[in-house]
């Protein structure tokens, strides 16, 4: 009888004790990192698009091997992507020409981790043609997009359930330069500085990088000044801010260089520190810089060079932000349009747009060197890679 009483008492105490919530229950860490791949779905002058939408893949965190999971609802050429910090929404530019009476678009998706599906939510006008880049502001309330043709940038509010609202602010760039591809402005990137909140818009056609202020209350982009004026005919394509230092790295597509500069908190240029070439002296092949990224550690910088070269360049970042070349590595395909370092910093995935492959490299954490893993995955016309949670 005493034994029964003790068992009943134990059961009552257990039932009355604190219960672990779903958040408190320890879950084993997944061995897969989810990432999304933007593609071209139609033939354009510079590419034979063979994709069917945005692709969802997983990467093995231990080996770097990748495997297909799902394809999004069909949309036209979702070439460049942005993943919302909420881990739920993915946004894509629809890179096409809407015609004389219309514009291209930006699409919102919802990601379901249970079945890896990417469901279409809505799309809105990009207020331009051939949008080629987009990013999410620091507050998570806006998508910012760059229209290559027409040379404009646009601010799109994120509304209920992750859908996009119509544009709240539009800025058109002016001017051009001397290269045949610079007959007009061609906006190629728009990003917000992670600390001071100011916005930089890169224009390949105008040879300019503009500084804007984002007014989240008024929902507007307000021009402040020309931030950086690269050399004539440089064709600035993308920039990347150092995660800790007030240093910016400018990838000049047309002349194949990276320019290193320091700036103030108000995005005022202070000093141009270095100009380093993607190719060795005497290499007369035409350069075509594409993507530029900094390793999560802040110690290394990488850039891709397309055209005849098809390489990934690796650099060590010095104490003053200067770049010291580590080496050049074959992309193992044609046109490395983009690459991405996974959030852990251990692996790099390279998207070879014109040979339909994604290649996995391992990154030496001490030296920044790239190590071939042997993993190559066939993916139709990959243009952009974005990891979930990055």
PLM features: residue spans?
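Short loop/turn segments immediately following beta-strands, especially the blade-tip
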Residues: 57-64, 108-116, 155-166, 212-220, ...
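Asp-box/WD-like beta-propeller blade repeats and closely related beta-sheet repeat scaffolds
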Residues: 116-189
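A short beta-strand motif characteristic of beta-propeller blades
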Residues: 67-73, 119-124, 175-181, 223-229, ...
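C-terminal motif of bacterial Sec signal peptides marking the signal peptidase cleavage site
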Residues: 14-15
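Short glycine/acidic-enriched loop and turn motifs that connect beta-strands
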Residues: 41-45, 95-100, 149-152, 206-208, ...
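Beta-strand-rich domains and repeat architectures in extracellular enzymes and scaffolds
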Residues: 26-60, 70-85, 189
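Beta-rich, blade/repeat-based domains predominating
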Residues: 75-85, 127-138, 174-196, 230-247, ...
């Amino acid at each position: 009888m005493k034994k029964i009483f003790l068992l009943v008492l134990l059961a009552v105490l257990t039932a009355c004790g604190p219960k672990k919530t779903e958040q408190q229950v320890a879950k084993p860490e997944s061995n897969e990192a989810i990432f999304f791949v933007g593609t071209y779905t139609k033939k354009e002058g510079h590419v034979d698009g063979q994709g069917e939408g945005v692709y969802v893949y997983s990467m093995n965190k231990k080996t770097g091997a990748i495997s297909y999971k799902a394809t999004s609802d069909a949309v036209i050429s979702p070439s460049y992507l942005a993943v919302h910090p909420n881990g739920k929404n993915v946004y894509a530019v629809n890179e096409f020409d809407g015609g004389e009476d219309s514009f291209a678009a930006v699409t919102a998706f919802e990601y379901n981790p249970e079945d890896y599906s990417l469901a279409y939510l809505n799309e809105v006008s990009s207020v331009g043609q051939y949008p080629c880049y987009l990013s999410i502001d620091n507050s998570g309330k806006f998508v910012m997009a760059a229209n290559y043709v027409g040379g404009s940038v646009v601010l799109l509010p994120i509304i209920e359930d992750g859908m996009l609202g119509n544009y709240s602010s539009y800025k058109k760039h002016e001017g051009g330069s001397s290269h045949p591809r610079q007959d007009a402005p061609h906006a190629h990137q728009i990003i917000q500085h992670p600390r001071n909140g100011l916005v930089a818009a890169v224009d390949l056609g105008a040879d300019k990088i503009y500084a804007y202020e984002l007014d989240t209350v008024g929902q507007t982009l307000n021009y402040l000044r020309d931030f950086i004026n690269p050399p004539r005919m440089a064709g600035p394509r993308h920039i990347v801010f150092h995660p800790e230092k007030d240093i910016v790295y400018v990838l000049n597509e047309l002349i194949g260089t990276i320019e290193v500069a320091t700036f103030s908190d108000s995005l005022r240029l202070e000093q141009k520190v270095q100009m380093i070439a993607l190719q060795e002296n005497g290499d007369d092949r035409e350069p075509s810089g594409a993507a530029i990224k900094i390793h999560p550690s802040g110690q290394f910088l990488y850039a891709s060079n397309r055209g005849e070269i098809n390489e990934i360049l690796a650099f060590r970042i010095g104490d003053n932000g200067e770049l010291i070349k580590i080496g050049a590595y074959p992309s193992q395909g044609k046109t490395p349009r983009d690459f991405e370092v996974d959030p852990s910093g251990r692996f790099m995935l390279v998207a070879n747009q014109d040979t339909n492959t994604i290649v996995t490299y391992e990154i030496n954490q001490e030296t920044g060197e790239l190590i071939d893993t042997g993993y190559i995955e066939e993916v139709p016309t990959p243009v952009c890679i974005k990891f979930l949670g990055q």
